[in-house]
Amino acid sequence: MRFIFLIFLIFPYASVIAEENNYGPVKEKINQSKINWLLDRHNLQEARGGTTSGLEPNIDTEPSDYFLKIIDSNSKKEKDRFAILAMSGDHKANFEFTEIFGSNPNYELDNPYKSWGTETIIVIQNSENFISLQHILVMFMKDNDGNIQGPYVQKHWRQDWSYEDKNILEFQGKNKWAVKKQKNIKKSWSQAVYQVDDSPRYESYGTWVHEEGVSRWVSESTNRPLPRREHSVRNDYDLMKGVNKISVLPWGWVMEENNDKIKTPNKYVGTEYGLARYQKVKNYDFNAAHEYWNSTKDYWNTVRDKWDKTLSSNTKFCLKKLHDNNPLFIFHFSQAEEFKKDKDILAAKNNIDRTIKKFISYECNIR
């Protein structure tokens, strides 16, 4: 049986991301005025994304300890915290993104995107008003002879949750970022999403609502740069404006995205709907993820510290996409591998400072 998963060029116990064309080419667009069903159109249009034969994990349908704590707690804030912590643990993650309509009557809908991976989500910070969750992919794959290869490890994205966050980092388009003051933050939590290299991606805030069987969080509308699956194949827009809805359930959690595609400054192009489903799994070997994290976490802690200082002392900045024809993550992943060998935190800090300095500008006059 074939499965679709999130393609990365990954090596055992290493972290190097895929070339962008591995996200799949645009193959056949469809005129939206000529079809009846938008979300389920596999009979009309092939999905893009990487494909391989993988080791299917066992789905765990039992509620997690944190989900049970949501039920048992009488404190609203504690319920919020347990809902966030319930996103941690071992999961099979399925990602689906589908364009559903465009502004032009004859807008050609892009190929749907589908991928999957197995990833563990580690709680790396946990205090009363702040929780940080690090996602790490671990894949076992079947070769042409049916033999299992792996594990293949990839440091993935990170999400930070802050209670009553007064400062929200907002993407402005054109590689620009700005810190915005927020006023109506009572009992709210912000979710800040970071790239695989711990550089910022987007941030928004919302309020958790707890009901029998589910805890939900819905964000305010959020500007964000194009994800890799899009900027490698699209040049007709340069900003997403999205709303996220997170549902924490007994068997895992789901993040829905409703994303408008914008050509800055204000031209609307189209809208996509996205669904990331995280199902809890059991009896799957994630030891390689924990080994990688334990051997590199001091390096990544230093990267986060550098970004924390940058964001706390600057209200605006810009990020270059490339330096010496390489993106930021290439430098960081290479340096993390060096740190695994020599454990020289001072050298790592100097490398991190120099590297981020090459990519960041406070004058915002970069392309």
Where are these regions (language model features)?
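Short hydrophobic/aromatic-rich beta-strand segments that constitute the beta-sheet cores
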Residues: 93-95, 132-135, 191, 196, ...
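Sec-dependent N-terminal signal peptides
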Residues: 3-12
